[in-house]
């Protein structure tokens, strides 16, 4: 499930304040929200366990959309500058939260794969095995 979809479900069930709680990570893991982009898990953990999640929740309820979006943009920059997360992952996490909270329909979530980062491929059981033709080629035959 996409991160923003999982966030919407969790927020619908537990309210927007769940963004600032450690248990958010367990809920998102249950929905397999990190399967496509495992690195986003660390970005979300930083947001949920720090003051950033609290501030996003506060601004979502007490501020204008413009103020929220200004903070969201500065948060993305902070995550990259201070925590050394890749810009694409910081953008994906913060934009997914913004969309899920319902602050603004103007938010567009761009997946990291749209910037050249491929989603993680699932193990199909064939990983690590080579065909007979490949084995023969490798052995010079």
Where do the PLM segments sit?
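Charged, amphipathic alpha-helical regulatory modules used
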Residues: 1-116
């Amino acid at each position: 499930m996409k991160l923003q979809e999982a966030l919407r479900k969790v927020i619908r069930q537990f309210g927007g304040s769940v963004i600032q709680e450690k248990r958010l990570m367990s809920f998102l893991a249950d929905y397999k929200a990190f399967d496509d982009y495992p690195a986003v898990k660390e970005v979300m953990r930083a947001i949920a366990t720090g003051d950033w999640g609290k501030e996003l929740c506060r601004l979502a309820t007490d501020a204008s959309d413009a103020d929220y979006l200004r903070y969201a943009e500065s948060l993305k920059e902070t995550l990259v500058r201070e925590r050394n997360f890749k810009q694409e992952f910081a953008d994906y996490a913060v934009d997914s939260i913004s969309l899920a909270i319902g602050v603004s329909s103007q938010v567009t979530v761009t997946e990291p794969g749209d910037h050249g980062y491929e989603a993680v491929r699932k193990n199909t059981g064939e990983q690590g095995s080579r065909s007979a033709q490949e084995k023969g080629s490798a052995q010079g035959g």
